[in-house]
Amino acid sequence: MDGIFCALPLSLLLLLQSCGVWGAPPQPRGTLCRTKPTDLVFIIDSSRSVRPQEFEKVKVFLSRVIEGLDVGPNSTRVGVINYASAVKNEFSLKTHQTKAELLQAVQRIEPLSTGTMTGLAIQFAISRAFSDTEGARLRSPNINKVAIVVTDGRPQDGVQDVSARARQAGIEIFAIGVGRVDMHTLRQIASEPLDDHVDYVESYSVIEKLTHKFQEAFCVVSDLCATGDHDCEQICISTPGSYKCACKEGFTLNNDGKTCSACSGGSGSALDLVFLIDGSKSVRPENFELVKKFINQIVESLEVSEKQAQVGLVQYSSSVRQEFPLGQFKNKKDIKAAVKKMAYMEKGTMTGQALKYLVDSSFSIANGARPGVPKVGIVFTDGRSQDYITDAAKKAKDLGFRMFAVGVGNAVEDELREIASEPVAEHYFYTADFRTISNIGKKLQMKICVEEDPCECKSIVKFQTKVEELINTLQQKLEAVAKRIEALENKII
C-alpha cells in the first residue's frame, strides 16, 4: 500500500481487518542447519601491519563463524594458528570440545606484531595442526578438512608449493585478503574453484560481512523442499539450512512470505525505473559484468512500452554518466543490448553526487519521466561513498521516489539504510559476494511489481460512501421519529 492512505471509520477498519483485507505480518521461514563433520583450522595473520583494533575485528569474525557451527568431538572441531614472523598454535583441534570454550579461547588470542610468514604457517597446518596427535581425524569422505587463511599483506616467504601440498593432502583452503593484500598470493593459496575460495574486503571493519558465506559453506541439510517440510503455496527453493518461497510468473509473493497474489504490474501499470550503478574501481571488470546481468535480470521481468514500464540507466564513479534516459528504448531487447554495451568507468565512489543527479535530472520530464507515474530508483554500490549522501537521499524520498538500495562486498549498511525507502527492511539488500546478486534480483522483481490498485481504495471508498449515505438516511428518520414523539408528549401534557 505504498503511498496510499485510506481514511476510514474505526468500525469499517475493524470490519476490513476481520475480513482479511490486510495480510498478517511476515512469518519466519523454517531453519534447519547441521554442519558436516569438519576439522577446521583458522590461520590468521597478526603481523605488524594488522593494528590491535583490526585484530579484534578478526576475532569477531572467527567467533561469528564458530557460532554457526555444530561443535563437538563427533561433529566440527576447531583449531587456530596465529602467525607473523613465527607461528603460534593458539589451540588445537582437540583442545576445546564445546562452542562456549572455543569462543572464550578466541577472545584470549593476542597479536604477534612482527613479519608475515604465510608459507610457514601453512606448513605448520600440514605437519602439525591437521595431525592426529593434535586432534585431526583420519582422512575420510565423511569428514571435511578446511583451512581459512586471513591475511592483509604480501608474504615474506613462498606460498605456492606449500599450498599445493596442503591441497594434495585433502585440505580445502579458503583465502581471505584484506586491504593492500597481494591478490596473486591469495590465488596461489586457495583451492579451486578460485571464485568460491578467494574473498577480498577493503578493510578489517567489514570482514564480519563474510560470516554468512562461511556459515552457509559449512551448512549441510536435507532438501526441505523435496521432503515437503515447507509451507510455500507455489514454489519452494532450497537454501543452506532453510528454504524460501517464490511465485510463478504473473504472481507476486505476499507479506507472509509463503502465499502468492496475481500481479497486475505486467499489464496496464506504468512505471518509471532508473538504475543508479556504482562503476568505481573497487567493483572490478569481471564483477561489473555480473552487475550488468543483474540489471537485465530485472528488465526481463518488466512489460516495457510507452504506456507501461520505462527504464533509464546512470553509472557513477568519481563523476556521473547517464547511459540512457527514460523512454529512449521502447522494448526489453533494446534496453538489454544497451546495458551489455555499457563501458566500465572505474575511479572513485561519489554516491551522493549520483543521487543528486537522480533527483535533479533522471526523473525530469526532459529526460523522459511521465507526470503522475510511479518513480522507482535502484541504487547499486559496493563501497563507502566518498561524499555526503544524506541530503540527496532524503530529497529523493521526499519527492515520492521509491528507493531501493543494493549493497555488495564493502558496502556500508548505514548508507544503504539511509538511501532506502520505508519500510527500510523491505527496500535494502546486501550480499558479500557479487556472484549471489542474482538472488537479490529475484527479490527486486517481486518488489517492483506495481499493482494497478494496491489497496483497492476505489472500491473501499465506494463502500464507505454507501454506508455513510445509509447512516445519514437512518439518522434523518430517527430525527423525524424523535420530533413526532416530542409532539405527542406535548399534546399529552
Curated annotation (Swiss-Prot):
Residues 1-23 form the signal peptide. Keywords: Coiled coil, Disulfide bond, EGF-like domain, Extracellular matrix, Glycoprotein, Repeat, Secreted, Signal. GO terms for molecular function: calcium ion binding. Disulfide bonds join 225-236, 232-245, 247-260. Residues 462-492 form a coiled coil. GO terms for cellular component: collagen-containing extracellular matrix; extracellular region. Glycans are attached at residue 74. Residues 24-220, 262-450 form the VWFA domain. It is found in: Secreted, Extracellular space, Extracellular matrix. Residues 221-261 form the EGF-like domain. Expressed in xyphoid cartilage and chondrocytes (at protein level). The keyword Secreted applies. CDD domains: vWA_Matrilin (cd01475). A major component of the extracellular matrix of non-articular cartilage. Binds to type 2 collagens and forms long concatenated protein networks as part of the extracellular matrix. Required for the network-like organization and bundling of collagen fibrils surrounding chondrocytes in the zones of maturation and hypertrophy. Required for mechanotransduction and adaption to mechanical loading in cartilage chondrocytes, resulting in an increase in expression of the extracellular matrix components ACAN and COL2A1. Acts as a moderator of angiogenesis in response to injury. Homotrimer. This is Matrilin-1. It comes from Gallus gallus (Chicken). The gene is MATN1.
